[in-house]
Structures are given as C-alpha cells and as structure tokens.
From Swiss-Prot:
It catalyses: 7-aminomethyl-7-carbaguanine + guanosine(34) in tRNA = 7-aminomethyl-7-carbaguanosine(34) in tRNA + guanine. This is Queuine tRNA-ribosyltransferase. Homodimer. Within each dimer, one monomer is responsible for RNA recognition and catalysis, while the other monomer binds to the replacement base PreQ1. The lineage of its organism: Bacteria, Bacillati, Chloroflexota, Chloroflexia, Chloroflexales. The gene is tgt. The keyword Oxidoreductase does not apply.
Length: 400
C-alpha cells in the first residue's frame, strides 16, 4: 500500500464519512475538493493563494501536460510539484478523459445535456483495443496513448496519485457498446497496474524511483446497474490504492446521483472513493451523503472567468452574476458566509465595476472566491460529519 486511508467518523443517517489520506506530500482530510490545474496552474491563481485558502490537493491533466510542455521536461525540472511551486499532494488523471472529450464532450456537458462545442476533425481520435491514436490540438501531430504510456507520462509528471487509462463512452451509448467498452477498460486497467508495479522501483530512464506513488482504478459501466456492479466487483479484487467513479454519469443530476447510488455499495469500504469531474454545491453535499470522499472540477475558476460567483443561496442555484446591474450599488461582499480574501476586502459593487470595465483583477478575485467557497464548504461538511451534524447541514443547505 502506497498511501494510508483512515476513516475517522461516519454519519449514522447516510454513507457520509470523514477520513484522512496520508501521502508522501502530506495528509488530505476528507471529504475533499481539489482545484484543477489543467496545465500546471489553477487558472489566474497562484499555488500560495489556493493553499492559504485551504486547498490540500490539486489535480493536473496528463493530456495537456504531455502535449505542453511535455512530461520529460517536467521530470527534468524535478516533477510537477517543483515545476509549479506546489508542495502538497497532486493527483493526475490518465489523459483518457481529455482525448475522448474531443469527441464526446465532458462530464459537465453530459449532465447539462450539451453536445461538444469543439469542432472535431475526421481522424482526430481513433480507438483500438491496444491504444488511442489522436491528433494534438496544438500542432496537429499524431500521438499514441497506451495504458503503459499513460502511466509512464504520469510517472514523469510525478503526482502522488495517478489514475488508470480508461475509455470514456458517451452517455447516449447503448448497453452493448458500454459493455464492450467496459471490457476494454478493464483490460487497460490490468495493464496499467502491471506496468505501475513493474516500474515503481525504477526502470524508466528519465523518472526516479517513486515507491510511494499510488494508483487508482476507475469504475465504469455507464448508467447500467449490472455493469457498474460488475466493474466495481472486478476492480475491488485488484490491488489498487483507491477507486474512482468515472465514465458516463448520465444526462442530468438525478441520473448522476443514481449512478453513484448503484456503484458505491459495491466499492471497498477501506479505500478512498473519488467522483470524477463533479463540483456543484448541491452535488458535493449529496454525493458526500452517498459515500464519496474526493471530488475535482474546473467549475470554480471557469465560473470565475465568466463573472459568476458562488453564493450560499439555493434559490439562485448557488450562483450570482456579478455583471448584473443590480449589484452596481451593492456594498456587501459576494457572500456573507465566505471568509475568503475577496469577501473580506471587496464589495459586490467593486467587483461588478471590475467586470464591466473588463479588468483582469475581477477574474482573479471571483475565481479565488469560488475556489475558497468550495474548500470551506468541504471543511464544513467534514466537521459536521465528525460532530454528528451532517443531516442538519444537508437540510440547512438543500432544504431537505
């Protein structure tokens, strides 16, 4: 075992639990939300800013870091921790999500019923039982990802937790295609595990040995209960350090939660569980209640760039448009519950002005607020589980 996971408290009314994951770069208290640093940075924010607002772990995207600047360069620079100036734990995805999202769109697209907006050229992605062949979105060059190649790249990046390479079928895929895809993904996960263990003590020319690097498997099966169960039961027999719920999560929030409901009971209790790509306020609370320990999502900074601030207001669906004219003379902070730098120092009126004037500071302040808001939410959830108040928190925030 290359990381330790200890469960400290459980909620008697749900599957919610509070725990601690110990890694080589520090302890992660769960449930936890990790900001996403797609290309080695959390957009518009410094590592110190997110650390000082409570970030414990961040996620890096293997696909993007492989294409630019390249995993071998990152390895020569001492790994992603040293390269980007972040001294806490890092998790990297496998690259599969981004490759398949070029064709099918991402998790957020599925749940909101959107089709991919990026124009995909013919031949941009080809899938075989052995590998995925794709064109770089940067220069059109051709690249091949095998399970082994994905693990090699992630080892070069040097994350504390790495993920298996997997196929991402779309939510509209039928049962037969999803079942075939699941077989392929399970074969790829076995290959990832074998290569990871064979190279953990060394053997890659540009990567120092890292016996503390953990590998998570990914449960697939689309929206089909028997496939989700089969995947979870298959993976729990393999020596992974944790498991993710990935693949298609359905076409709306309710279906996503049903996928979590049908999957978690078949996952090992002693391993951390990560729900990939989910970060809305209500989803975080509801999926903690369903037994999820770890979350990641690009939404806090993406919303920030587009002038949307997270607020504690279910009637607004947790979102406030800072460019709204009603905020022009509003002296209050973005959110009275939040204690981030933005909310301590600036008014809604000032942030409204920044966005209307197209000042970059506006993007930074709202992005920082959004990240800090979710990080505080997760700390509050964790404390409520430890103190036996999670059911009250759930009712208070969601009105249920």
């Amino acid at each position: 075992m290359t990381l330790a996971f200890d469960i400290e408290a459980r909620d008697p009314h749900s599957r919610a639990r509070a725990g601690r994951i110990t890694t080589a770069h520090g302890v992660i208290e769960t449930p936890v939300f990790m900001p996403v640093g797609t290309r080695g940075s959390i957009k518009s924010l410094t590592p110190d800013e997110v650390r000082n607002h409570g970030a414990q772990i961040i996620l890096g995207n293997t696909y993007h870091l492989y294409l630019q600047p390249g995993h071998e360069l990152i390895a020569r620079m001492g790994g992603l921790h040293h390269f980007m100036g972040w001294d806490g734990p890092i998790l990297t995805d496998s690259g599969g999500f981004q490759v398949f999202s070029l064709v099918y769109g991402g998790i957020a697209d599925e749940i909101k019923g959107r089709r991919p907006t990026q124009q995909v050229q013919p031949g941009m992605v080809k899938v075989t039982d052995d590998a995925v062949i794709f064109k770089s979105y940067i220069d059109g060059s051709m690249h091949v990802f095998t399970p082994e190649r994905s693990i090699e790249i992630q080892k070069g990046i040097g994350a504390d937790i790495i993920l298996c390479f997997d196929e991402l079928p779309p939510f509209h895929a039928g049962y037969d295609y999803t079942a075939r895809s699941l077989e392929r993904t399970h074969a790829w996960e076995r290959r990832c595990l074998m290569f990871h263990r064979a190279t953990q003590e060394g053997g890659l020319p540009f990567v120092p040995p890292n016996p503390y690097q953990a590998l998570f498997g990914i449960v697939h099966g689309g929206v089909f209960p028997d496939l989700r169960r089969a995947s979870a039961e298959y993976l729990r027999e393999l020596p992974f350090d944790g498991l993710c719920i990935g693949g298609s999560l359905g076409e709306n929030k309710q279906q996503m939660r049903e996928v979590v409901d049908m999957t978690v009971p078949h996952m090992p209790d002693h391993l951390p569980r990560h729900l990939l790509g989910i970060g809305d306020v209500d989803d975080l609370i509801e999926c903690v209640a369903r037994g999820i320990d770890m979350f990641d999502c690009v939404s806090p900074t993406r919303l920030g760039r587009h002038g949307t601030a997270l607020v504690r207001d279910a009637e607004r669906r947790w979102k406030l448009n800072v460019a709204n004219a009603a905020l022009r003379d509003d002296p209050t902070p973005l959110d009275a519950w939040c204690d981030c730098y933005t909310c301590r120092r600036y008014s809604r009126a000032y942030i409204h002005h920044l966005f209307r004037a197209q000042e970059l500071l506006g993007i930074r302040l709202v992005s920082l607020h959004n990240v800090a808001f979710l990080l505080k939410l997760m700390r509050t959830i964790r404390q409520s589980i430890i103190e036996g108040r999670f059911a009250h928190l759930r009712a208070e925030w969601l009105g249920i």
